[in-house]
Amino acid sequence: MLLRYFRLIRINNWIKNVIIFSPLFFAGKISNIVLLQQSLISFISFSFLTSSIYILNDYMDLEHDRAHPSKKNRPLASGKVPIAHAGGMAIVLLIVGLGIISQLSIDTFYVSLSYVVIMVAYCLVFRKMALVDIGIIATGFVIRLYVGSTVTGIPNSMWIIIMTFLLALFIT
């Protein structure tokens, strides 16, 4: 039973949030325990935020997913997780994620909040607009980079910003 909730929040997609550690790694400060701890907390908290967005996206795609050969097995589309449970879980993940991040750094909070706003707009409006949707998804990866930068105080170089965006465009 618990497995369906783990599938709902897409823990397997949390790997995308490893980008948060990039500023720490590229600055050669990965062994700094305090910065590593802050990055780890922001990674977990940001993962809560991304999970809340995945739930919203699954809700928005519900009818389409039910008719899709493989997506029909997703927890919401299959009915294995009630919509009310998923909605409640999304709200809790969002509040907890933003709450923890707000305790780390106000800048990290605002960067994370911008991610939430952009991704909610994506789910509600932009996901059906070709090229715009890809640009927004790629921007989400750059925002992850800024989460790592703001929580550690390590500035991102222009090359890592550009390369992250281009790589995200490529894999999207």
Question: Model-flagged regions — what are they?
Answer:
Residues 1-66, 80-88, 92:
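Topogenic membrane-insertion module of multi-pass membrane proteins
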Residues 2-6, 11-13, 124, 142, ...:
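C-terminal membrane-associated helical module and adjoining short loops/tails
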Residues 47-59, 117-125, 146, 164-172:
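Transmembrane alpha-helical segments that form the membrane-embedded catalytic/substrate-channel core
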Residues 130-140:
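Cytoplasmic-side transmembrane-helix entry/capping segments in multi-pass membrane proteins
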Residues 60-64, 108, 125, 130, ...:
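Membrane-interfacial segments
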